[in-house]
Amino acid sequence: MGNSRNKRGKREANRQRTVEALARAQSGADTGAALQLPQKKFYRQRAHANPFSDHQLKYPLSPAHMDWASHYPAFENPDPAQTNLGGFRKLLKDVEVVDIGCGFGGLLIGLAPLLPETLIVGMEIRIQVLDYVNTRIQALRTQQRHFKLKSAGGGGSDAAPESPAAPPTPSEAASPDSTTPSEQQAPTTLVPGGFQNISAIRSNTMKFFPNFFGRGQLSKIFICFPDPHFKARKHKMRIISETLNAEYAYALRPGGLLYTITDVEEYHHWILRHFREPEVDGAVPCDDGADGIKELFERVSDEELQQDPCVEVMREATEEGKKVSRNKGNKYVAVFRRKADPEWPA
């Protein structure tokens, strides 16, 4: 028991040192060039959280009451009169991309330079994991600001290049030799957008997803390596269901994409059934919801997916994706396009 308290104290002390170092770098008292990113081992938490428990979450009354400006200060509307129903400053653009169950933020970091002008948010229910992600993002933003200042002022030899370097390819990011250093050391070059376009919030998607996003607001939704909940009595906890798919369809604009990836073949077939894809392996569609889901989504062909760089990031840049690659496991990808709303009969 005493050893457990000692380990917990060490983790808390390390997290505090990380926060203090970040605060010094943000204030300009310390350089951000060698800023260390937080380490996952000091942000330990259970792998799963019960979505049906009362987690005492804070959530907006409606999308118009959400405080997005605190998450994306670089995109804050400069006009102080531009506020939403919650009294918070509006943004110059809306959040368009969501990573449901973002975990330790690998997909957010991978997508940030790929979509530098698009606001991306991760949704995570676990407190310690969310704390890690946001600390990591703040550290990356701080280092990028230092690099930009040094580049503009012709700083010393440790200054970043004047032009943003191309981000590493997903396969390079997923190499086993790069996973450990990349967690500890921030990037050494400028990246497009400077990670100002990503953030993460604590939320229970199964309960409060429509409280954050309005109708047709999103262009992409990612669900990467979700908890498979193998036991039949826990299937109701799966993040893919016809009920939830209807909510995703509400928030996705026509033509928007919903990306899914899992390393569990049974879950992959579950996903296909709940998006009404019975032709795959002779699967029979489920009967737990309305047939209207089939009218809202269509599956994207493999030929189209080969041209989508987001698919490669989803496969190789996430922490779970890297682990599956190291274990030489299979990855099952399915992407669905939001159809235009059907017309009402005359």
UniProtKB/Swiss-Prot annotation:
Name the pathway it acts in: tRNA modification; N(7)-methylguanine-tRNA biosynthesis
Keywords linked to the UniProt accession: Methyltransferase, Nucleus, RNA-binding, S-adenosyl-L-methionine, Transferase, tRNA processing, tRNA-binding
Annotated region Disordered: the residues are 149-191
EC number of the protein: 2.1.1.33
Q: Which reaction does it catalyse?
A: guanosine(46) in tRNA + S-adenosyl-L-methionine = N(7)-methylguanosine(46) in tRNA + S-adenosyl-L-homocysteine
- Do you know which SUPFAM superfamilies this protein is assigned to? S-adenosyl-L-methionine-dependent methyltransferases (SSF53335)
> Pfam families, from UniProt?
Methyltransf_4 (PF02390)
The record lists S-adenosyl-L-methionine as bound by G101, E124, I125, N204, T205, C224, T318, E319, E320
> According to its UniProt record, which protein family does this protein belong to?
Belongs to the class I-like SAM-binding methyltransferase superfamily. TrmB family.
Task: Report quaternary structure and partners.
Answer: Forms a complex with trm82.
Listed name of the protein: tRNA (guanine-N(7)-)-methyltransferase
The source organism is Aspergillus terreus (strain NIH 2624 / FGSC A1156)
Gene name of this polypeptide: trm8
